[in-house]
Amino acid sequence: THLTTLTEGATINPFDNKVVIIDEAHNFVSRIVNKLKSRKKTSLSVKLYEYLMDAIDCRVVFLTGTPMINYPNEIAYLMNLLRGPIERVLINTSSVISWDEGMMTSFFRTLKDIDTIEYDSIKRLIKLTRNPPYFETILNEKGERIAVKYNKDFPQESDILKWVDTWRSKFQEKVSGIELNPLEKLQKEDLECLPTKFEDFANLFLDGLNIKNALLFQRRIQGLVSYYKGADERLVAKEVNPDKRLVKVPMSTPQFLRYLEKRWKEIQMDSKKGRSKTELGEDFSSYRTITRLACNFALPPELDQKDISKEQLQEEDFQKQELDAFEEISKDPRKFLTLENLNNYSPKMLEILKNIKKEIGDGPYFNKQFIYSFFTTLEGAGLFGLVLETNGFQKYKLIKEQGIYIEDPSLKPGVPCYAVYSGENVDERDYLRQIFNNKYSSDFPTTLKQSIKEPNRLCIFIASKAGAEGINLVNVRNVHIMESQWNPAIVDQAIGRAIRICSHASLPLEQRTVDVKIYISVFSEEQQKSIDGPNIVPIRRNDTMLKRYDVEQPTDTFMTTDEYMYDLAYRKGRISKNISLLLKQSAIDCEIHRKLHSKEQPVIQCMRFDTTTKSEDLAFKPSYLLEEKDTLYLRNIIRKSRQLQKIRIKGLAMILDPVTNDIFDFVAFEDNQRLLKIGTKISPTEIHFLV
């Protein structure tokens, strides 16, 4: 493999002394967590993770707009990769006549690469961490550390255990009465910036859907994050009615009964596996797959497969196994997919169809529609293509003549077309995307381009999860998400296919809008209370749980699988947004971009340490286990009151503390009364500004 070549047969670390840049880093981290959860520790992503964590003098740069995809503790893996392992050496003593911590600290402060110094007087143990490579400590005249400075010529032994031997003899000379253990008896710890184990992360930082110990989280990630909002909002299409994204579609009676049959099978399977139904740290990619499909389309009994194995459930696109049923529907689609029949088998698809007909407008310039489904064929993207074809639309087709692609001349003029972005022919898929966008690359076949009679006829683009990744669409006016997902990142990625920088630049200003709809099947009021149906009582008992979305207070509700998935995504989304806010507030450039980000909601209040904090104080301790929780940390902060004055110097407004002569930024003070020190008044006519 390529990794074997890079590592020369696992004999070297390819990331030693390297700068590693990873785009879309959330995908990389998510794969690591998924593989570790499934105990696949030999997978490529896990091996890369281990090589990065073990690399010597490696710098990692991650580019991402998404802090987490599936699990809240993904952010811990991401931050740990950026920070690297916090190496700490544990130095036992073989002989102690006099344990003088002050004398030892005085010696250690002469070593320019020491970061933290800790002692265990009972075990006679010294614990030391070091600055990153090439960073040396700067001391003031009192011997206090006031800064660290990069110095490319500053040497450092890469092995922290061997490093002890570089100063051992000097220590014995300066500190009498203490004998250090030899190198072979020293120990090294690799500490984490944040806990990666889900239970540990949740216990330390999660409080329901909120974040606890936010200050602790922010202190430990200091210096790791940069945040810039990005392009001018005027370059991005605006989503209209974002508060009306969710479309709840009540089930029909036939669909409800079919749903109950399938749900009972799932409950029995879950009970055998002992599966939890509310754990945020669980993989839901194959959870309730049978009823997720039933929420889209309730197959009539004569077409439904009798049994679905456990192995099939582990395949996210297992619906391919139901191609026989799909082919049966294809033979006589009017039997199942007319408006009347859709009302029985899939009220949800009927609702999507109605909205498309309402929004698509009149030709020849149809409003472009993007339809996304997690599922590929039956009950998903492929089936909805048949729904369109049965109800006044036509499938866009390319044909080959003598090896050359052209538009199918048999297409009906003036009838809007759809295309499903699937299939193994990569070229054909990309041609369809370019025709939909009406924007062609330089290598697009000239013959095909000349054969296109109505450039805007292909106006409906359907894609599944597998197909939607990485594609860019242009001038989409409506996005239809066919089912709820188990995490909001999937929905955001799908919407991101249609709303991109300058994706609507060719439209008039008033048309640069996108309406997004997420459709979920729900129980009607009658079905919520019904006692008629197979196994309805045990199903209701099992599936009644706290509903948190779309309610003022969490309420026990009998929810469909669609609703449950949406509620799960809502919970994950709340946590993700809260973590994202902490990242933005902790960014090293937060103050620099404060004005640019001033319109964001919730408001970004840049993290800052208390004004009594001294330069030698630590932002965080090496081990998160020894950190003060926020309640104790805040209790120990010395609270001071100041009488401040607003002054103007050469027309510039500033804030002055007349007692200390500290000068603070006026704009920052207006922003939630934040005191951002920018200098010191040293005379009535002179100010020394911080550099």
Regions found by a protein language model. Name each.
Residues 1-472, 511-530, 536-632:
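Helicase motor interdomain insertion/brace
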Residues 487-509:
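Conserved SF2 helicase motif VI
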Residues 482-485:
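Short beta->alpha connector loops at strand-helix junctions that form conserved
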